[in-house]
Amino acid sequence: MTVFRKFAAKFHVVDHCTKSNMFALLTKRISLPQLICAYRCRSTSSAESCGAFDLVIVGGGIVGCATAREMLIRHPTLKMAIVEKENALAMHQTGHNSGVVHAGIYYKPGSMKAKLCVEGLKLSYEYFCKHDIPHNKVGKLIVAQNKDQIKKLDDLYDRGIKNNVPDLQLVGKDCISKYEAKCQGEKALWSPWTGIVDWAVVCKYFANEFQKMGGKVYLNYEVTGFSEMTESKGKEDLSPILVQSKDKCIPTKYVLTCAGLHSDRLAVMTGCDLSPRIVPFRGEYLLLSDSKRHLCTTNIYPVPDPRFPFLGVHFTPRVNGEIWLGPNAVLAFAREGYRWRDINIRDCIEMAKFPGLYKLCFRYFIPGCKEMIKSIFYPLAVRDLQKFIPEVSFRDVKRGPAGVRAQALDNNGNLVDDFVFDGGKGSIGGRVMHCRNAPSPAATSAMAIAKFIADKLETDFKL
């Protein structure tokens, strides 16, 4: 027994060093993945001393944290953990978006996106008020500039009504200034429930609640693979999956991945198909000067062109008083490529080998080139903004922050616009669920998405 204690102390085999199971472990074969993992875990860290879990969620963005919170509310006795590769939560998509609380206007009636957005809108505002999270219902104007856009605007209104978007209304040319004094257009759609919030703050509130209920959060934990503990096969009381990192590992019964920009890579680790692949698109914002902030008090959006996948540049007030203009949409050369000079060789090679990206680029070649030109010569983007507020000039703007959108793409170059869940192959795959695509507006819908995923976890894993 003394020999085993020395072995356990040296290799930190997580959650298998109790007196009750020392002898049992000594009489069992230890698999190669376990030995590798044990060797990696030879230096003590907080993750190694935590023991085994019922459920580990990979990814500390808003969908992962909201789902973790929802699962512990439903099942307070579950032992759960969130692992995040960065040194803080909400470091990527959650912390680099426009901060808009969407009302659910754009989405196909009856679709999951439409239902979850409208439900998430109401749940979000209730949560903000309950926890005194700074937010503001500034509303949104979707402004038509010509007759062709008016027809599309009317179609959007019908879609919003079918989606049960609250208090949606059409306003004529003379009434636009009632909602935004300096805004011009032929007709507009007014959505008073659209708002603004800092979604990174909301994400951290979810994580704090999760921790208060007994959940654990481990930062700087980059998952490098999943392996199976062979001696636990067929035994429900053990934790057969090892969630591996570079120098540590955590045993768990089940795994949910909500890895955003890296979701496809984690899925492949458990034998899932390569498709859909994640292609990173960078959205770059401009900042309106302090002296011109009075020009914009509400969200101002163009009528979206159905030929193109993104909503177009818009005016967005922020809870800190800033006005963001944009974003554009340009292909990034790294999955975490927030600047032009951010280039990741591995990411570029993967994109170069992916036929779906070539098909997408061919389909949107001209608008894609225009977006890249506007990215380099940003004063050109101001022309689009002047259609709505003519008083804005290129002297009033400067470069602002950027975000990277994890766009799921199939092999035919089609943008995947719905939720994608996957498991994998073999005994490991049966215990792992991958959220491979949680499409925009995932932040607004996060609490509703969490309920949906929790239902699926309960069904698939019989929790």
Predicted features and spans:
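Flavin-dependent oxidoreductases
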Residues: 66, 226-345
